[in-house]
Each structure stands twice: as C-alpha cells, then as structure tokens.
C-alpha cells in the first residue's frame, strides 16, 4: 500500500473523530431540548449563528478576551432562550406546523438582521488556541483538539446534569407525564425555560467555537440544522446517549464520503444511508418511544 | 349537517384578491413613474440634463445578500462618478445615469422574476449584473427582448454566455480571468512545479469551467494530478478535501473560483495536515480575506490572483477615487473594495454609450463588441473571449498577483489576465 | 362455535401477559371475560383483533385461521371491537363517526367514490339510513349532530359500540363497556348490549366489574394471563378462587 | 384536524339553496381571476399571478397529504422533481412540453408511491423528519447529476409551452389547470376517501378496527398529492424557462408548509389564501430591497399569534365573537 494512501486513511480517521465531536457539540443543545422536553427548536441553527456573531463582535470590535467573549455570548443567548420558550414554544407546544412557522419567522429575522447589519466583510473569530499538534505522521491543529475535548466533556456534563441533578430529574418527569409533574408541585414553566436556556447556551457555545474554526456567514446555521436533525432522529428520540453514536456515524460519513465521491453527491448518498438505517430501526438507534 | 362555511371562505378569498389588486395597482403606479422618463434637473451645464434609467440586477437577499449589498453600493458610486464627469452624451444631449435595482433573492427563479420586473415593469433597455451563475436566468430573456445585458461575473455554465446570447457581455473579470492570470504567473515564476491538483466548488461548473481549466493547464505543460476535486461549498469541515488534495501528491494545488470561506479553509486544513505544497488561489476574493479565514501561520507559500485590494499599487486614478468614496460611504478609512462587479460594467457602459451615441441596444452591442480597447476602473481593458465563449464580448484587464508568506501579502505584479 | 383460541401466548420482554389461553366462543352467546387489573384481558382483545402479534398459539374465527392478520383485515372478516380509552374520532360528529365506520358492507370502490356514481350515492344513502338506525338502537339519536369529543363519557362508550356495529360484525368485542359510568348509564348500556345480542351478534365482554355478569351466558375468569375458571355467572359468583383473585384488586379502571 | 361538513349530501331540499351561495361565490372569484389580465397589462404582474397559481396547486396538494396526518416536508423537493423531469424531457429528450408536463406528474406520483410504502409505518414526527431527509437527498441527487441537470446552476432555456412571448396564454391555461386540480382535490377530500384520511389522522387504531387500511389510504394520499405537485413543478419549469435546486431547497420546503399553515390546515381554502397572501405581499414590498424578508417575517408572526388556525379562521372568529356578544348567557364556556 503506497504511503499516500496510508496517510489518507489515517487522516480520514482523525477527521472522522474530530468532525463527529463537532457534530456532537452542535447537536447537543437541540437533542437535549427535544429529548428531555419534547420541544422541537427549528431555530437552533440561527441561534448557533447568533452566538457565533456575538462572540466575534465582542472579541474583535470590542477587543475583549476571547474566552470571556465566549462566556458572555453564551449567557446572552441563554437569556434569549427564555424569550424563545415564552413566545415560540409554550404557546404552540406540540403543534409541529405552528412551531415551524414561528421558528421560520425567527430564523428569517435573525439571518437577515445579521446580513443587513454586518455588511460584507469576511469575518472570523481569532483562533482560541494557536499551533499544530503533531504525533508521528498525524498532525492536527490544537483548535480541533480543543473542539474535540470540549464536545466530549460537554456531552458528559449534560448526561450528568440529566441523571444526577434535581432539575434534570424534574425535566424528565415533566417530559414523561406533565399532569403528574404538576401534581408533584414541579414548576413546569420554570423547568422548560431552564431547558431552553441550557439548549440555547449550548448552541451559542458551539457557535463561538466553530466561528473561530470556520468563518462566519449569516446563513451558517442552515446546513447545520439538517445535520442536527439527522443526528437527532438517527440517535433515537428520548435518548441523549444516542447523540454520541449518531454524531459518530454522521461525522464519519461526512469525513469519508467526500474522499470517495465528489461534491454534492455526498449529501445524497448520506441521506440514502440514513434513510435506510431508519427504515430498519424506525425508532432510531437508541430510541425508546415515539414523541412529537 | 352544516355545509362548509364557504360563503365566509369566499369572502376571505375576495378579500385576499382585493389586497392583491391593491398591491399590484401599487406596482403599476411605481412602474409608470420609474420607466425611463425625462425628469429635468438643473446643474452647471448649459442645457438641462435628462436622466436615463439603467437596470441593476443584484442578489440582495439570500446567501449572496450581504456581499451584493456591498457591490451595489460600489455600483452607485460608479454611477455618481459617471454623472459628475458630465454623464453620457447621446445625440448631443447630456444624460445622467440612474440605477433601478431589483433583488434576485440568490435563487435562479428569483433572478428570473427580477429580470422580468426590470424588463416589463421598469421598462429598462440595459441590465447590469447579476452575480455568478444567475446570469443564465437573464441572458436568454435579454436575447428574447433585445436588452443589452452586461454581466457582473460568469462561471461559464450553459446559458450564461455563448454564441446564442449576442446581447450579453461580460463586463468584469470572471473566474476564467483570475485563472489565466494565476496560470501565467505560475508558469513564469515557479519552474520546479510539474504536477498540479485542481480544486473548485462542485456547483455544476466542473463539466464546463473545470474542463476548460484542465485543458489550459495541460496546454501549459503541467500534468494534472488525479481528477478535479469538487468540494461542497457548504461543507462544515473541509479537512476531508484537504486530505484528498494532499493524497494526490501534487507540487501545487490551484483553487479555481470559489469564495474565501472554502478556499481559506482548505488552505488552513492543508497546512494543518502538515503539507507545505504551493497553494494557488485564483478568485475575486482579496488575499487579506483568504488570510483571515486561513489564519496567519497557515497562510504561507500562497500565490493569489485576485481583485484589487488595499496595499496593491493602484492601476488608475479612478480606482483611487472609487476606493476613497467607498471608504467614505462605509465610514471605515481602510475598508477594502469588494469586487466592483457591478461598478466596472457601469463604468464601461458610460464609455460605450458615449462611443455609440445611441441608447438602442442593437447599436450598443455592435459598438461594444467592435471596440478594440475599453476604459475600465482597472485602466485600459481589451475585449476578447471568442475561444472561450464563442463570442467576442468578454472584457479583460490586468489583475494583481500577490504572494503570501506567514500571513503577509506581498504584491508581485499586474498580470494581463486575458480571456482566450 | 364461532371463535376458537388455543394456546395463545404473548410475552412482553420476558413476562407473559397472556400464556397458553384456550377459549371457545359459541354462536350467539354473550361471553363475559373478567379478571383483576393487568390480568391480560385487553391484551387478549388486541391479540384477537391483530393489533399486536401473538408469540405463539392460534386464533380461529369461523374455521378460518386469523392469527397475526392485520387489524383491518380482521375487521373485514366480521369482528368488531370497542376500545377502553378514546374509542372514537373526536373531531367527527356522532353521526359522522358511525357513517365513517361503514367501510365494508356496503363498500364502493375508488372509481365510484370519486366520480360519485349512482352506485356510490345509493350506498351512501343506505349507509346514512343504517347509521341513524344504529344510533336509535344505542340511544344516541338525539345528539347525532354534535361533535363526538363533546359527549359525556358514557355516550362516547356507547358511540364506540355503535361504530363497532357499523361493520355488521358477527362477533363483537366490548372492552370494559361500563367502566367509569354512572348507574343509569350502566343500565342503558346493558340494555343496549342485550338488544344487540338479540340481533344475533356474538358478544365477548371484558369487564372487571362483577355487575356485568348478569347478562352473560358464560363467564371466563382470567388472572396473570391464565384462565382460572369458567362457568355460568352463578357458579362464578360462588367460586372461592375468584373471590380470592378479587380481594387484592381495586375496582378502578384497568391501567 | 377539525372536520367540517357532511360526507354525503343530506337529502333534504334546502341543500340546493345552501350550495347556491358558494356556487355564486366561485363564479364571482373565477370571473374576477379571468378578468385580471384585462386589468393588469404589465407582463410582470401576470408573471407574479402565474407563479401564485403554480404555488397554489403545490400548497393545496401538500395540505391534501396533511389531512391524513402526514407532514410531507419533502413536498418542495417533489415540486423540484416534477420541474426537473419535465425540463430534462422537453430539453434533452425533445418531447413536447405538454407531454413532458404529464410525464413529470406521473413520475412524481410513482416516486411518491414508491417511498410511501416503506414510510407508511412511520408516525407523525418520524415521517416528517424522514421525508425532510428524503427531500434533501432527492434534491442533492438531482443536483449531482452533472451535465443532465446542470448542478447548482440548474437548467436554462427550457422549451416553453407557447412559442409566443406573451404571458396571457400561460395565465389562462394555468388558471384552468389550477381550477381543475383544485376541483379534483376538493372532490377527493369531500368524498369517502378524504374522510377516511381524516379518520386515520384522528386515530389509526380506531380506523383500522372498522376496516380502514392505514397503509392503503396513506399511499393514496401521497400519490394524489405528489401527482399534483409534480404537475405544478412541470408547469413551473416550462413557464419559468430556468430552474435550479436553490428554488426547492430546505428553506423552500419549510416555506411551503408555511403557505399551508398560515392559510389554515383545517380548511380547503387555507393553502389558497395563504399562498396568495404570503407570496404576493413580499412582492409588493420588494421596493424595500434587502429589508423585504422582515416584512414576510412580520406577516408570519402577526398571523400565527393573532389567528393560530390560519387566515381562513378569521370569518369564523368574527362570527363567534358576534354570537358571543348576542348571547350573553354562556360567556363562561369556551
């Protein structure tokens, strides 16, 4: 086997891992919100984009410390989550059509708002960490390593939150049986608002990180959204652990397919694979019960 | 059992149609006013100056939105500059140019609708733009209705520009220009490059532009490593493509067309993956943008054939003025120009109108295609393109070549990026 | 003998909801199927009507093996059923509920239906008149034009029966027809069931309310997915095992 | 989905009078629509009307599928499929555009049937998601066919239905096609087929217990819906001369369901009104250039928060309000 091929294979494996962790990072907030609260946030991509732009703005225009900027972006977008819960999700809970309408409205406003206000300058948040990390013939930029680590650790944190903390348990209670939860004296609105805050914060975090890895465009959220939905359905509804494996599958496909087929065909093949998987496991890989 | 409440539904249908009626009545009103008319304005010149309306087709919303909003600003500046130099003189009468802008929404059918609006609603006889492959929606329409069409860009896809679209001109350097410029420089200054890999966005242009590029590369005596690598413009991560490029084992990679995001990302990923191969970027996006995306440490050993940018010696006084006005407009003293993709055609149009001394598109197109040299914002340009497009209607002019080392762009030379 | 269940078993992940059930139902009788909560009565119904597939065993209806057939096929063969929970189309009116339950006899093909041929119109007219009759039978005629979801619980249950009758069943499975009803609703329901069985329809009742026994010719008591005893209502009332089985269990509706 | 009206014409005399009012109404609307080219001479405005007609067919067919409780997020992709099939047939194969139109509709229907057999097992949310994925995949697949479909740049200079450049014949032909399609869809919905679809939507368990085959009727719904959306796609391609994937992408898919939802999913007239309003209002404000999208967003929010059952619910709301005023007795109910 020629050396080039071996390099290609190794590179693909590395890419698959890193890309998967990126997708896990992206999908975490969305899947969390849907699996735990049964809320389908179609505007996740737009929120991710807003988070990226806020972080960019603070880090470059204001000249703030990068990590601080990220934290502020996360906080700000988290607050936006309360707004989302109150005006987008609570009034239309369970009606997918109306949720789509509201979310499209929000997406339109956010994307065009950014597009109009920012004007055309290629915008990139400066990298959080510099340099390249070499092991033998494999070499990755530290940025990607950081994204990888953050993605995985966030997943663990969210799992801990759901299973160990009081709020996490309350969320699951609300999701499983609303009336029961109310009878138990759980403040349902508080719980769901909390869930939305967490979800949006996670989206913003992903946005800030990816914004430094890729460049920012007002429409960066659109393609992300499809990926996120793929991961949600593939992972199975009602299972956060599913995200890990779904993310791995989608990431690997995205890392390997472009090497075999060119350009847009990758997406088609990918969808085909995903649909086939779902036809054999309609509940997704780790799905428990159907909701929504 | 009650029948469906159709009377009520019908009232709402009527209501809706009434609303539509009103709205479109509004449209017609605007149409009559904005049609190419004669509103007199008083200026320094002796006789009153009439205004002549020119249509500008831009993608103001959608994924090209922010970009084209900027280029439309440039176009407006160009119009002001033409008017301040006395406008255009046709039949001894001075005319000020006036732009009517329509939005193509970054979709082909949106662009078709906008073109329809310009032609049938705003009654313009000259259309500038649109961007990228959206020309394919306009060229045919203009041919049908005998409208002069000066495209702002061209990706060489069918319907954009060929022997059948005689009313269509390419008024601005397109992907083919940037490529020829880069190739010529590469040939002259990098003798040790033998094999090159080709990468370009897989937006359907590979069978056309890609094929042409491949031929030209081989004609220049290079061997193309592997097939053309088509990347997905909207990919989240470009490292797979980078891996693919490195795996070809070529001495250099040429990224044809495409925008800053994919090109910069691929550059970054190629470097991160540990390869230091020569990286040639030939597209309108300026070097500083590519550096922004790729990062300073990663952007090294790069040759970039691009539009004019801050730091390259200005080819003409007009361009200097253009830059100053643009910076004034956006209120940023060192904002780079975008690409002039609409400003350049307008500037040329002024030249052509003066030469032709008529507003008749048929006359204009003959004059335009028979001009040996034309005045562009980049200085004198030539008209060619018979070999590439089948018609001699593409304007080409000198383009700046830049090398980048450790994130520092260094201007090298002006290449006469001729369209064969 | 209209229905014969032999060795019917259903396991939900290890534990057996129904195991080795053998029941035979004779023509025109009213068979009571009683047992405490979670005894597997509803599961048995779902097995008969093909909503869930049995692990093993067979269901034979009129000498025809219907084990594991799709629910709508079984319905076509003439087994009607009602449901414990939300037994109707909530957004149809009561009459529409019954009309739209006429799928099999008469059935007009797509062509007739679309082109509104005389055949289709004849069928629909017939269906309308039949539906009104059925509503008379179950005593819902006066509320026929009101939305089903706005009806009281008892009416909804009766509507369930009416819908089941609309497919002209030879065998009718009633899943807790009187659960959660008030006394006079119960009396009406029992009246209606009696009238129905007089039309020659074989009926199987699931109930864990002993009161229903008085209209049954025969009663089967099941617990933990198995048949405990079988006999006339009188025998059952005295049977010590039944008493025992019932002591532990409350009388609220099943899951 | 709330269901109104009767499945059969109740055989009492005054239904004739009942049916008369809508009949007159229809006549009025059709006359109005037929007169439009005489009112508006501008080809551009006719262009807008023609596109509206096409989208109305698409939206109405989408709603028809939705009556069975399936949310076909792939519908815009089917519009694209129809458009591409008829474009390829009439341009590359050289069939007559009219024939291509019909074939496009049939192909779209066949694909719809083919996918709806495996998908019929899936319940609401999963169906929506998988059809979304299928739509994306289908579009990307079409896009990646290289020279045949011209990738992202799409197909240009598609043979047109009429040689004349005027848009008036298009308007009348498409108006006729739209009316026919809507009539057929309305017939399907008001006969037993439509009722069975609504029954399945309300409870597939109950409907199967009375002998309604869920799979059969879901497939029927998808087949009919896809046929008409394919037809609309073919009309679009042969009228618009140029098509590209970006016209049918994810955003388009979601906008399509918005046309339906804003108009109102519960009523046949919903998608018609929704499309007319949502497609034409932004056109009216197109003078705002890059600020136009905010207008459509504003319309969305206004409608969804004011009348969540869509625009068709306005008259009903007004009426109930009026009745409340009249009858002060039951103010506490509702």
Set out the residue ranges of the language-model regions.
Chain C
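Glycine-rich phosphate-binding loops of nucleotide-dependent enzymes
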Residues: 1-255
């Amino acid at each position: 086997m020629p050396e080039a091929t071996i390099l290609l294979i190794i590179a693909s494996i590395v890419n698959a891992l890193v890309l998967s962790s990126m997708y896990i990072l992206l999908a975490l907030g969305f899947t969390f919100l849907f699996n735990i609260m049964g809320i389908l946030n179609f505007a996740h991509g737009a929120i991710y984009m807003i988070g990226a732009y806020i972080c960019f703005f603070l880090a470059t225009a204001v000249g703030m410390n990068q990590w601080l900027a990220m934290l502020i972006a996360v906080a700000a977008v988290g607050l936006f989550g309360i707004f989302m819960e109150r005006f987008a999700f609570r009034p239309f809970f369970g009606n997918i059509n109306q949720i789509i309408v509201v979310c499209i409205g929000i997406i339109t406003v956010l994307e065009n708002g950014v597009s109009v206000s920012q004007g055309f300058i290629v915008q990139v948040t400066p990298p959080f960490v510099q340099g390249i990390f070499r092991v033998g013939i494999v070499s990755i930029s530290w940025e990607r390593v950081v994204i990888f680590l953050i993605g995985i650790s966030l997943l663990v944190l969210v799992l801990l939150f759901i299973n160990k903390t009081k709020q996490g348990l309350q969320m699951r209670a609300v999701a499983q049986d609303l009336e029961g939860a109310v009878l138990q004296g759980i403040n349902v609105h508080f719980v769901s608002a909390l869930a939305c805050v967490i979800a949006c914060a996670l989206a913003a975090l992903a946005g800030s990180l990816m914004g430094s890895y890729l460049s920012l465009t007002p429409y960066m959220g659109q393609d992300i959204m499809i990926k996120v939905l793929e991961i949600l359905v593939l992972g199975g509804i009602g299972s956060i652990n599913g995200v890990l494996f779904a993310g791995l599958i989608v990431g690997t496909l995205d890392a390997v397919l472009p090497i075999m087929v060119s350009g847009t065909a990758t997406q088609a093949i990918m969808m085909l694979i995903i649909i086939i998987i779902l036809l054999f496991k309609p509940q997704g890989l780790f799905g428990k019960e159907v909701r929504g | 059992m009650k029948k469906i409440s159709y009377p009520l539904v019908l009232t709402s249908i009527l209501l809706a149609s009434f609303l539509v009626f009103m709205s479109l009545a509004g449209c017609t009103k605007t149409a009559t006013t904005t049609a190419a008319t004669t509103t007199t304005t008083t200026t320094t010149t002796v006789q009153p100056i009439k205004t002549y309306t020119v249509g500008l087709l831009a993608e103001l919303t959608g994924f090209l939105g922010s970009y084209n909003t900027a280029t439309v600003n440039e176009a407006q500046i160009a119009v002001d500059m033409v008017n301040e130099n006395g406008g255009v003189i046709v039949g001894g009468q001075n005319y000020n140019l006036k732009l009517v802008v329509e939005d193509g929404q970054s979709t082909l059918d949106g662009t078709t609708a906008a073109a329809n609006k310009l032609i049938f609603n705003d009654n313009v006889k000259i259309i500038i733009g649109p961007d990228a492959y959206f020309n394919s929606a306009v060229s045919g329409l203009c041919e049908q209705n005998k409208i002069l069409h000066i495209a702002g860009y061209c990706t060489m896809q069918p319907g954009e520009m060929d022997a059948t679209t005689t009313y269509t001109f390419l008024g601005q350097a397109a992907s083919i220009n940037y490529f020829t410029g880069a190739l010529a420089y590469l040939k002259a200054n990098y003798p040790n490059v033998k094999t090159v890999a080709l990468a370009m966005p897989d937006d359907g242009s590979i069978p056309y532009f890609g094929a042409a590029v491949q031929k030209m590369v081989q004609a220049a005596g290079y061997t193309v490593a592997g097939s053309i690598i088509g990347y997905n413009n909207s990919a989240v991560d470009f490292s797979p493509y980078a891996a693919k490029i490195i795996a070809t084992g070529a001495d250099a990679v040429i990224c044809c067309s495409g925008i800053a995001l994919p090109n910069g990302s691929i550059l970054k990923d190629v470097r991160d993956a540990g390869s230091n191969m020569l990286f040639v970027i030939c597209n309108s996006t300026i070097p500083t943008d590519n550096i922004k995306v790729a990062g300073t440490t990663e952007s090294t050993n790069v040759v970039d054939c691009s539009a004019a940018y801050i730091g390259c010696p200005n080819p003409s006084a007009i361009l200097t003025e253009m830059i100053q006005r643009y910076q004034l407009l956006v209120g940023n003293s060192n904002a780079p120009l975008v690409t002039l993709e609409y400003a350049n055609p307008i500037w040329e149009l002024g030249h052509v109108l003066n030469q032709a001394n008529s507003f008749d598109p048929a006359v204009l197109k003959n004059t335009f295609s028979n001009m040996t040299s034309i005045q562009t914002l980049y200085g004198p340009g030539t008209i060619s393109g018979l070999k590439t497009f089948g018609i001699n209607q593409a304007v080409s002019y000198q383009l700046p070549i830049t090398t980048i080392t450790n994130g520092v762009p260094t201007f090298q030379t002006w290449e006469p990026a001729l369209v064969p | 003998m209209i229905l014969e269940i032999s060795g019917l078993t259903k396991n939900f992940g290890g534990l057996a909801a129904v195991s080795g059930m053998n029941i035979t139902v004779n023509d025109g009788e009213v068979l009571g199927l009683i047992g405490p909560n979670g005894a597997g009565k509803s599961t048995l119904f779902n097995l008969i009507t093909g909503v869930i597939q049995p692990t093993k065993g067979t269901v034979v209806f009129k000498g025809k093996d219907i084990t594991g057939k799709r629910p709508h096929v079984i319905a076509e063969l003439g087994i009607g059923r009602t449901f414990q929970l939300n037994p109707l189309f909530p957004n149809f009116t009561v009459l529409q509920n019954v009309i739209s339950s006429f799928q099999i006899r008469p059935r007009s093909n797509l062509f007739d239906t679309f082109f509104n041929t005389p055949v289709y119109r004849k069928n629909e007219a017939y269906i309308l008149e039949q539906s009104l009759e059925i509503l008379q039978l179950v005593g819902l005629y006066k509320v026929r034009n009101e939305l089903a979801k706005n009806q009281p619980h008892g009416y909804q249950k009766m509507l369930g029966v009416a819908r089941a009758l609309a497919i002209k069943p030879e065998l009718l499975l009633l899943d807790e027809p009187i659960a959660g009803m008030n006394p006079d609703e119960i009396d009406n329901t029992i009246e209606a069931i009696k009238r129905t069985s007089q039309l020659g329809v074989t009926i199987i009742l699931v109930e864990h309310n002993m009161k229903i026994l008085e209209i049954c010719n025969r009663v089967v008591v099941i617990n933990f997915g198995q048949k405990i005893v079988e006999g006339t209502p009188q025998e059952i009332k005295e049977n010590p095992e039944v008493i025992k089985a019932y002591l532990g269990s409350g009388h609220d509706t099943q899951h | 989905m709330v269901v109104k009206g009767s499945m059969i014409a109740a055989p009492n005399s005054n239904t004739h009078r009942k049916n008369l009012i809508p009949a007159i109404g229809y006549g009025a609307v059709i006359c109005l629509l037929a007169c439009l080219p005489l009112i508006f001479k501008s080809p551009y405005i006719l262009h807008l009307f023609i596109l509206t007609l096409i989208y109305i067919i698409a939206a109405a067919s989408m709603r028809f599928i939705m009556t069975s409780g399936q949310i076909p997020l792939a519908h815009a992709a089917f519009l694209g499929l129809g458009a591409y099939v008829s474009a390829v047939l009439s341009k590359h194969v050289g069939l007559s555009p009219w024939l291509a139109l019909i074939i496009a509709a049939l192909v779209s229907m066949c694909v719809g049937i083919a996918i709806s057999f495996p998908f019929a097992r899936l319940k609401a949310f999963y169906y929506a998601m998988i059809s979304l994925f299928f739509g994306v995949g289908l579009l990307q697949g079409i896009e990646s066919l290289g020279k045949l479909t011209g990738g992202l740049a799409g197909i240009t200079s598609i043979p047109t239905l009429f040689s004349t450049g005027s848009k008036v014949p298009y308007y009348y032909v498409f108006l006729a096609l739209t009316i026919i399609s809507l009539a057929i869809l309305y017939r399907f919905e008001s006969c037993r087929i439509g009722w069975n679809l609504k029954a399945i939507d309300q409870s597939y368990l109950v409907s199967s217990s009375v002998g309604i085959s869920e799979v059969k009727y879901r497939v029927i719904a998808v087949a009919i819906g896809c046929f008409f959306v394919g037809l609309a796609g073919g009309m679009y391609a042969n009228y618009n001369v140029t098509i590209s994937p970006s016209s049918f992408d994810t955003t388009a898919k979601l906008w399509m369901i918005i046309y339906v939802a804003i108009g109102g999913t519960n009523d046949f007239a919903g998608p018609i009104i929704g499309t007319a309003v949502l497609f034409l209002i932004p056109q009216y404000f197109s003078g705002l250039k890059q600020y136009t999208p905010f207008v459509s967003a504003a319309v969305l929010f206004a409608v969804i928060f004011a009348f969540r059952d869509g625009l068709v619910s306005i008259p009903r709301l007004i009426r109930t309000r009026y009745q409340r005023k009249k009858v002060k007795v039951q103010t506490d109910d509702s």
